[in-house]
Structures are given as structure tokens and as C-alpha cells.
């Protein structure tokens, strides 16, 4: 029998709910009927009665066991099943009938000592004129007395009085009938309960008394009925009330609830309190507020509590019949019913009350007239106890609702005290009683209020709330907000359940009323009330229900790359921080936006019953992506601005301060790392296969349905070479299998699908398949597959090369080998994408290589189990051989491998291919191919090749340092003739039969627990050239400046695409081959772009996937997983395909000479030197350029899955057919778009296509419009493009619907031959962000800057021009025209092209002259805000990509504070700013994405920072002296008087990653607020003399809470003038020049500033120093520089520099560089020589290369003889030619990159 049946029943109901929900998610409806029946049974009243009866029988058994033998127990059970003992059940005469007189009855077994005058006088005094009762109750031998008491503090000197709260029906006290509710107990066993007895002692007396309990109680006379009575007793209705109207109301519950709320008690009756508008009762129309409920069904509810009535209503089922009455004719008190917990008498107003001192208080009367059914519009709060002013407390006005009666009256103010309502004195009433009085008052309400005459209110109130709600009762915890001592105790220790029921009676009552007040039984209201109880009154809880459906596949396909899945489904972006998940933005027109309920900054608490609060971001986002609709969202909105208050924290945990600007984490809007789901055509195609003895010839896997995450689909994984499926040509990897003969595979598990396929008998099999929808550029290679005829079937056996290897259904996440892939800042941070990313040819291997690389980049571990693969044809007994030398790696070994999770593969067959079979079969093999010499146990000769579908979905990159890599023995069994034709994949291992071998891949990368490796490789001597100087000639600058990058993964934050590349310097590794042993490396990658970084860079190339430890490569210890191979024995692999790389390595001599790059580790702030670089000869340039031109193709778009099919062919006719087919598909793709579709091909000239592009003026729509056409460009010559055309594709790269950044990256990488798809719509002109204008002509000698309308000239020996430039959307037409008109000089900057002969692959075209990321003078591209460091003393523009986290900044200050500036308070280490590494605490933020924060308030700054997009552009100012020394703090003492029971009225916050505790908020009306000296952002240095500078927030909070009386604080405040002066200095040093030439280019600004500051310094110094002999003498400066160190200087000058042929001098010195550490170099020093090499006659670029490649001990000879003044003036004049607009001009984040690339290189 259950211990607590009610609780157990609720738990069972909850379990049933969860079970039903899970079954619904799985689509299982078979158990619905049984579960519903079970559910209804548990909810039925009969079942509740049975449970109650069981409990009563158990209780009776306990009673009977303890009743003496001479007693007879007369008991009964009530209708509900409760145990009731009848009167006279104890026959020994101990129970007496009540006496009606107040004198001592002769029946009493004891008589009070009347002679004791002192005792009597005390009792009389305590009774205060009330009726005195003497009661003697015999405590039973078992069980309790049957009543509970409550202790309430009276207003008389803080004395605590004990009142009877409740008398249990059927108990000893109830049968005695003398003890009543609300009786005040004056004495217990002759002990008076005066001020000498505490309430704990009184309760102990009640509980510990044995035998007879003698009580003296005081009771109000029952005949008192005056409306002004001070009695708080529940008014007892007359025994015979004549009702004016009695009516029977029947309501049929339709599931939405009854729609009314009740209130009341036993004696006053239960009354209808509220009627929900639109609810059932409201629609019925008969029930009215104020109706007394007399009977429900056949149950008389008079005398019941409201909770009992609520239970009766719940048990009624759907039909509720009630007898209600209204308009009593009898005299009923207007005093509202009060709960039993209140005292019986209203104590008189103390002499210190507000009314007594007219000098301090004024009393006034207000008359309010209700409008139709509306509330009065005031919100009240109660305070019980002694306030900090010593005055009596009571009910205060907390807030006034705008538009209400109180609001229009105008006389009532917040903090007014309400003393009477309609003449009824309410002093001493609790909140909910006053609420009832106000609610039950008539149309006209008279209020008597008291207000302090002084301006500074000392009322004990919190700041007013903005919540616009009607007056509503507060929950019991809020009843007495500060000083309540309500202690409720059961005095008799009854049965545990009854005790619990009594102790929680009030809470249950209130909760039941709240539920009924809303829509009863409504899940939304239950959710709301549950969270309201948890969060308290400071939060508004909202429940929203969404039922969204993705309309069709095309819609999801169109947007899936632009928005995260959860954003697409819910229509909100979610930022997460520390377990809180906030809505950061709402998608316009999305589901949540349509609902109109939620706002940004609302916190998401729960979705579909899953609590998100407290969960990590990864858990929350993962759940939101998978949770099925409809969605029930529970959100909360903070109603107050206070934080983790020192006084009264709202939550148990420390609240997050408001000043943490970015609590949140942003979702990468591109969702680069979450992979992308495949989509299939809804059209089902029937493929007929003839099953033979070998099966159908394909393998399958299950895959998450992109449209329903709870379901899976069956997908063709791979085809068996020369199998039935491959020969038919109708089935291809990636096809979705929907049916087999008559069997539908919808929602079928993988195992079931396998069984169905295996069970199909041999013969004709009908397969229903859906082809994948693809958008990739390789669509053109799959035209045969989509054609209606099958006439070309026979070609597939010879042309499909290893298709399945390109099918990875979940895009992977990044390298696992974290130590090697840390982010690192480089010396030249600007990453021009220029020519290093030449687009590649449309080679057939592209798709394969791309997906191989994705496979190499390892998906998350948990995703491995989602892609189990089963080969469904053959049997798998072949794998059961226990021979350890047969390295086929059964499942058990895979499971043992610690770094690789089990894939749960089942191999149902293999196929053995003879070496001399037709090459088509070998070329078409799928999966991982294993060659084993140990095949003899199966009876095959060594020449045979065993092919097996090893289908590991990913190969984690295992560090080469781990020595337990599993290795197989591979022999030279591959026929190399077929290799020339095959498209070599990861799974194919070509080995020369006779010569040296090269292991390109390992079939299964798994690690065993023990050292089970076979000794396969013999040790041989190897030689490694570790110093670059030993092979200088091969290290061209094309390697040194390569920008490809492997993604890094932030621990705990998911995987994130980095902002830019951090490759170390190239190095040479020599590996000597060993006879008959492979090199021991496997490679991955190729031409295809694998990943796009956030700044538009592309990740591509050949990478080392694994190095076998005992192999020749492994023995060198010089190669590791993730290294990028730049060159092999003179063959450039930077743009090589996978097959070309394999051939190059295979054909390399002995030794094999690799040039490789590794990712460097990430320093936090210090920038790193980039790479060593040497110029290469013209022949090398030419050769490399020829190779690159041979391999030019397109960069693929962000990948859709599955990848497209490929068909190798060289037939020109087929190419034409393919193009026609592709064009047809393109037209189909955009058939729904309005306008005329055009497909053209253009040949770029040296200036690009001659197009100017802009976006859509509607920022929510992503479009790319042609706004200008150069009359001399290819587009104008072709004549088919017009202004207003919208670009959809370039070289099959889809631009439609893409962001500006994506489009920019694709445009930049376009090759010379460009295929454009665009649409022409007449309305386009109205949609364009920039008014169209013609682009003036340009020539190689004079390219005018047109704000980005011209192509960037990326010069390589003056030979090639690359790129289509976009017009920044923030530039208006007028600005663009004015810039053209104001150009003073041709901006074909000759110093760029002539000084720096860049290598073909360079992507740092403009940064070679600048090591610090700051502007040299060579090109305006030298400052990249994404990478440039922050120079102290000047305003800097920086960009930070948030990735998967928020910015992670906490700020202080604002125009509404004395600080008058927005200053970074802390940089949180998990945020994007910390990863970026440039922002420090103390930096001032001047602008955020064009929003000027110089004059913004604190809240405005927080809003601006929170509502930032993915890329955040900041203008910051740093003064290193600030916020670091206390000399910058204004230190002053503040003394606050802390009153008893009150706090100081301030909230604090500490740094999580540093020391210091700061004031985050001042509570209105608190001690700190009244003092008026403290502000937000002040630092608490000490408390009562105790140093708090290094204390934690918790420590300071505890000390402040425990402090009493006078609290002495020492406060530190950043000096108000310090930031102003700092900004003035900044403006003097930088802004003044900008005012003189407002168009100064950002790249010149730092140099001009530095030089002019230096000039100013020199001017104020002694003029004699200019000719000082010591300054003019050469100085030798020695610098020690490690490989990872940044030199940290910028130079200017050199032959052919824009300043003229002047000597090279130091233009800037970065504080974090090694040069600055010497403290011997100065800005303006002329560099005479570097390591003994004179610089006379060298060009700027030559000197740059010398410095960049100088490591170790660097000797500089310098002379301080540069004429800085002349150079600074010359720079200032030059900078006016750039006219980029004021630096403070507004701009959009999308335009930041373009704004810095407006001039030619």
C-alpha cells in the first residue's frame, strides 16, 4: 500500500504523460487506448476515494492498536473515504460537552487558581476584553490533539501571539467542540504565554504535555457584526440566510477548464472570485463574481475550505452542476473572508503610527470609480515588522497601472500607505485580504491613505514594478516580504501525511486558487504557474505554443545554409550563457514573430517539457534541432532591473549582472559546423534489378530524415564493383531507398531494411528510389543519371570511379588533434584572398576530394552511431577467420579502439577481384580497399586482390606520437596501369608491384589497447633538413603566405571556423624510401575548397591524414597529422588534385623531399611572425603559373549532401550535352522566381568583369544586384548584362539567398572564364541598396578608387588582375560620386605593384611591408580590422567574429554615469573577444557596428552590444595606464547605516577571471540610493576596514549581508576626467588629422599618428638635440627572435616607395613585439643594415623579406637622422587622395571588408 497515495498517483500520472509523449514522438499509437484508459482511471473520483479509503483503513489500524481495552471506538468513513471518530467514542467520560458560560464549569477536572490575582490579571490583560474560555483536553495515548497553531508577531512591542489555525475534523479537539479556529491561546497548563515565553517554547509546551492539556484561550464574541469591526475573524454567515437569488448552473467542460476562480473558507463560504474572459463560465453567462457556491452535484460544500471545494470540482468530470446564491438579505459583514491564519483581533494603531504625527505624515481620502469590470489599477505590497524608520508597517502602494482608475485619479502615489477601504480599517491585514477587500468593493471605492511629508520616502518598499497587471494576491512567501515570522506548527505529531497536509494547507490553497483562477486543468497555465512559483515575482512567465511546418524541401534547402536549424524551425536566434538561453533576435515573419508574444532578451526556460535552463548551449541547441513540433515554449521576462542583490537575492544562485554585456553565445549563422542534411526529390523512381546469387550489389545505411529528426531514412551507401546495381546504372550512392517490391521502407530501421532485402527471392526486384536534390557545381557531371532513358547504362561500369567515397552524409566538424591546431595571430594579419585562391577546373575529382577531406575532418563521436552501414548481399562468414595476420579488423577491434567509436557495421559480403580483370571493375570499387598477402587460408593466390567495404564514417586524425596505431600488412598487388585511369580515393592503396611503395591510406584507423602492432616496417636511416636556410631556394613566398587553414575546435564550445589562418613557416622534410615498404603516410584533400573561413578564406590543399609510427615517414618525427604538403620533390601541390598529389609522391625519387607547413599554436595576444619567404625566380613563377592555369576551376559552394554523382568522360559531345542539361536544370531551379533568366559566359580581362555589385536595401533579404557596368569591361562588351540584374550563380556557385560574405568569397575566386546566371526583374531597381550609376573607365595605369566598384588589382609582376568587387551597401550614390570627383591622384598605387613582386600563390599581397598588421605605406589594404592589433593612444577599428559564443564582455560606464564612457570591465575567457585576444579590460568602446557609444547610456551600450550580428565591428580606444593602477581611481569613503532586517540596497558583481568586486546596481529607496554617492561600476576596496581588493563576490556579499549598523565602505571610482582627457589626447593625435583630412585612409592613420606624435614630441624638446652628435651616430641593436615571436615593427621607405626613394626607417613599433623589448629602437630610426647586409638600393619589399626571414640573433644598425616632420606632412597630403569618408561614418558590418579594399594593391 503506498505511503502517500496522492503523491504516488501524481508521479504515476507524470510517468504516463512522458510515456505517451515518447510513443507519439516515435509514431507508435498502438498503446494509446490502453494508456488513455489507465490515465482516466487514475483521475477518476472513484479511484481517489479508494486510495483515501485505503489510507484511512491504515490509519484506523494504527488507532485501534493503541486504544485501551476499556474503550470502545465508534468510527465511520466519510463519503470521500476519510476516517471519522464519532462523538462519545471514548466511554470513560473524559470528554465533556462544551459549556456556554465563560465561568468555570463544575465539570472541569481542574480549576484555575482564582486566588492568584497576578495570574488572573495577566490573563485579563492579554485577553483585551475578549471572551475567555477554559478548555481541558485529554491527550490520547496515540495520535495527536487534532489542531494546529500559527505564531504571528503582533504590533505590540514585537510580541508573538499563538493562534489556533485549524481543528482537524474527527480529532479529539474537534469532538470536544470548544476549541475554535482563530482562538488565541493565552496560557498552557497555567503558564501564561506572555513576552517571557517565545513561540518556540509555547509550541514545545503543547507538544510535550502528556495526559490532560489545560488551555486558556481568548475569543471574539460571535455576535459582533459591525462593518467597522476590528475583528479579522471569518464572518460567520447567519444560520438562516435569505438569498435574493438562488440558481443552478451546469457547465460542460470542453477540456479548456471551467473558467472561474474561487476564494473563501469554512465559515465565510466559498465565493466565485474571478471569471476568465472567454472561458467556459464566461460563455455560459449565468455565473457571476461574488456568487456563493452552496452545492456541487450532490455534495453540500458549505463549511468546506476553498481547497476542498476545488477538489470537488476536479472530481466532477466533464459535467459540473452547481447551486449558487447571491444577494443575501441577511446582514453580512463587508469585511472580506480572511484565512484562518490571521489573528482574531485587529490591534489598535500604535501611538507611533503614521496618523499620530501630523508633522511627518499627511492623511488624505481618494475616491476611485471603477470602469466596466476593470480593476482599480494599483498593486500593493505588505510589510510586517518594524521598518527601518521605526514606524508601524502595513500595506503600501507598489505600482500604479497606466490607464487605470488610480492612474487617472492622479492623487495616489507609489509608496502611499493604505489604512482604510470604504471605512474598513485594514491595518494589520495581509496582502491578499486587502486585495479581496478592494476586489469586493463596489463601483465607487473610498481609500484612506497616509503619505510622508518629506521628499525622501523611507517606506520599506522595493522599486516600483513596470508590470501592468491587475491587483492580484501574492503568494505566501511574498505575504510578508521582509520581517515575517510566520511559523506554522502541528502541535500533536499526527500521522505524517496529515501533518504534511496541514503544514502545506496554505500553499496548496493558494496554488489551487491560482490554477482555478486561470483556465483550470490547462497545461499552459500549470506550466506558467509552476515557473512563476520557481522564479518569484520578479519575472513574467509566458507560455507560447507554435505549430510550424517546413512547407517543402526546396524551402529547407534554400535556407539551411543561412540559418541554424533551430532558427529555421522556431524563428529565433538563441544566445546562451552560463546555463541561461536568451532570445537574441527574432526572425522577421518567423513563427515566434508571427505570435507577437516574445521579445529579444526573453529567456527560454523550457521547450516541450524539456527544461533548457541550466543546460549547456550544445545540449540546448541539439534539443531544439530535434524536438518535434508543435512547440510549447516557456519563456520569462525580467520585470525589474536589479541583479544579485546583496539584500535579498531572488534566486539561490548568483544572478548574472546586467553589466555583462554579452551573457550569450551566438550561433554561427552559417552553421558551418553542424553539417548539412541531404534532401531528396519527392518523385519516386522505380528501378528494376535482377537479384542473382551474389545479391543486389549495394550497401545501405540509415540516415536522419532532414524533415523529421525523429525518423530515419534508408540511403544507398555504396555499390559493389561490377555488381547487379552498378551494372544497371539506375542506382547510385546517395539515392534514398523507399520501397522494395511491395514493402515500404518508410520509418524502417536499418536492421529491418536489411532483413527485407535479404528476404527478397532471386529474380526481378522493384526498388523505389528518390534521387537527391543537389545544387553543387558538379551537377553537370550527373546528367546521364537524371535523363529519362537508360540508353547510357553501359557506360557506368567504366565511368563511375569510386562514387561512394564522396558520400559523407554528415559534414564533419574539424581536426581532433587539438594540440596541433590552435589559433595563432600572425604578423601580417590582413588576408587578401587575391590569387592564392584561383578557382580550379571543373575536374571530376572535386567532389570526391572535398568529401574525403570532410571525412578526414572527423565528425563528432556521437554522430558515428547514426550512420551504421550494412552490406546487404553476401554472407559474412569470410570474416570469421581468427587469423591475427589477416588484418580485416572485425567489429570487436573497432570497439576496442579507444579514440574511434564503434560504427556497428555488419558486412554481409565481399567481392574478390582478380588482378587482371577489366580495369573498370577496379576503378569502380567502393569503400576502403584492403590488400592482404595473408589470403591463403581462403584459397586465393597472392596475386588476388581482396576488396572489402570498410566503411568507417570518419578517420580521426591520430597524433603520430601515439605508438599503438593499428597497422595492416600491405603488399604490392596493385596494377599501376589502372591507376592512371582511376580517381584515387582514400580507400585505394596503390603500390608498385616491383618498385618502392607508398601507403596512401590505412583502411581502418583504429587503436588497440595493447601494443598489437605487427613489425611491418624496418628501420632505416633518414635525413631531415630542419632549417629553412638549408633549402632556401625552394621556399618561395607562395608557401610563406599561404592562407589555407584547418578548422580549430574550441574546447567545450563546439567546433568553430577560425577567423583567419595561422600557418607556421614552411619546412623541408626528406624521407628515404625503403625497399618494398611504403612511406607510411596517408593523404587527403585536393583542389576542392573544403571549408570557407569567416573572412572568406578557403581551406584547400593536400594534407597529411596519418603517419604510421614505424614507417620511414614516422621515423623522421617531422611529419604529423594535419600538416599541409606544399611541394613534393619540386612538384607544387598547392592546387593539385588528389590524384596528382598521389602521382607526385609516387613518382618522386629517393629521398622524397617534402615541403610542409604546420599549424602553429595560438598565443593569446602577441602576434606571431608569419612565415619565411624568399623571392622565386621568373622561371619558377612562370612554371607555377602554367601549372595553375592548367588546373583552374571553380571553388565549390558550401556543400549540400549527398554530393553529386560523377561520370568521367572526355567526349566533347558529351560535354555539350552536359552543358545543355545543366542549363535546363538551372532554369528549372529558378523557374519560380519572377523575371527573365539569363545564362551567359564572359571572359575576364585584367580588370575583372567590369561589374559593380550591391546588396538589397531590405537587410533581411540577401540579394546581389549589378549597380554599375564598366563601359570598357567584358560585361559591357558582351552587352547582355544590364544594371539591375540579380546574380544567382557564378560558375555554378549558387549566390541566390547567400550572405554578402559568402558571395564575396565566391566572386573573388572566380577564374578567367566565368559563367553567370542572373535574373532580370523590372522591380530590381527599387530593391537595390545603392542607386545604380555608371562606372567610369579604368586602365592599368590609372584605376580610380570608386568605393569598391572597381576590381582589386592583385598584381603579380604586373601580369594578372583578379576579382569582381562589390559596392559597399552603406555607401550612398552621392558618396560614391563625390569620391570619384574628389580623387586628386590616380590610385593605381605604383609603390604597391613595383615594390613587392608577389609570388603566384600569395594571399598577403599588401602586407609584406608590415609585420605588425599595421599600415606600412605600401597599400591601403594593410590594415585588416579582423587582425590588426590595438595601438594604445588612438582609436582603432577592429572586427571580431563571434562564432558559437557571444562577445564575452562586461562593461561599465555610460553618459548616465560619472565615468561618461563605455569601458570594458572584464573579458570572459569563453567569449569571442577572449579568443580574438585583442580586447583588454579597460579598453574604451566608442562604436559598435556604426552605433556611436560616445554619448550613449549604459543600457543603450548593452543593447547595442547584445544585438550584434555574427561579425562585430568595434571602434575602441586603449590607454594602457587606465584601469590598472589605483592612481587612476578616485578613492573615497562611504558610510551607510544598515537597519535591522534591511539590506544596504545595492547589488554587486565580481570578475570571474580577475579580482575586484564592483557595484552593479543601486536599489531604489535603499540605503545606498538614499545616500546618493554610489553609482554603478564603483569598486568596493574595503568593508569596515577589511581589504576587499582581491576578495571574491561571494565573500563580499556575505560580509555585507552580515554587517550591522554603520557599514564603512572604501570606494574606488575611475576618475571622471581620465577618459575624457584620454579621448581628447586621442582626438588630438588622430582625430585632428582626420578633421583636417576626414578621408584619411585607416591604414595611414596609425602611421601618421605615430609620426606626428613623434614630431610633436621633438618640437617641444630641446632643439639642440636635433644636431646632437650622439643621436646622429650609428647604433647597433641586437634582437633575439624565436620562430614564434613577432618582430613588431613597421618600416617605410626604400627604393620606389610612395614617399620617394628615401632610406628605410622605422615607422611604427608594436609594444608586444620583440623589437620593443630591447627599448633601443625608436620611431624614425633609419635602418642602415640588417645582419651586416647594407640596405642601400634595396626596394621596400626586399627589406621586408630580409626582416621577415630573420630569426635567432638579428643585428640592426640604425641612425636617428630621419626627417620625420617632412615625411608626416607628405603622408598627410597623400592620404587625402583616398577619401573614404569620415571614420565615424555609419556602415553595415557586411561592408567592412569591402571598405578596406577600395584601392588598388
Swiss-Prot record:
InterPro entries: L27_2, L27_dom, L27_dom_sf, PDZ, PDZ_scaffold, PDZ_sf. Residues 1210-1221 have a biased composition (Acidic residues). Residues 134-221, 248-328, 365-453, 553-639, 686-772, 1068-1160, 1239-1322, 1437-1520, 1533-1615, 1676-1762 form the PDZ domain. Keywords: Cell junction, Cell membrane, Cytoplasm, Membrane, Phosphoprotein, Repeat, Tight junction. GO terms for biological process: establishment of apical/basal cell polarity; establishment or maintenance of epithelial cell apical/basal polarity; intracellular signal transduction; tight junction assembly. It is a peripheral membrane protein. Expressed in renal tubules (at protein level). Expressed in bladder, testis, ovary, small intestine, colon, heart, skeletal muscle, pancreas and cerebellum in the brain. Its main location: other. It holds the Pfam family L27_2. Forms a ternary complex with PALS1, CRB1 and CRB3. Component of a complex whose core is composed of ARHGAP17, AMOT, PALS1, INADL/PATJ and PARD3/PAR3. Forms a heterotrimeric complex composed of MMP5, LIN7B and PATJ; the N-terminal L27 domain of PALS1 interacts with the L27 domain of PATJ and the C-terminal L27 domain of PALS1 interacts with the L27 domain of LIN7B. Component of a complex composed of CRB3, PALS1 and PATJ. Interacts (via N-terminus) with PALS1/PALS (via PDZ domain). Scaffolding protein that facilitates the localization of proteins to the cell membrane. Required for the correct formation of tight junctions and epithelial apico-basal polarity. Acts (via its L27 domain) as an apical connector and elongation factor for multistranded TJP1/ZO1 condensates that form a tight junction belt, thereby required for the formation of the tight junction-mediated cell barrier. Positively regulates epithelial cell microtubule elongation and cell migration, possibly via facilitating localization of PRKCI/aPKC and PAR3D/PAR3 at the leading edge of migrating cells. This is InaD-like protein. The gene is PATJ.
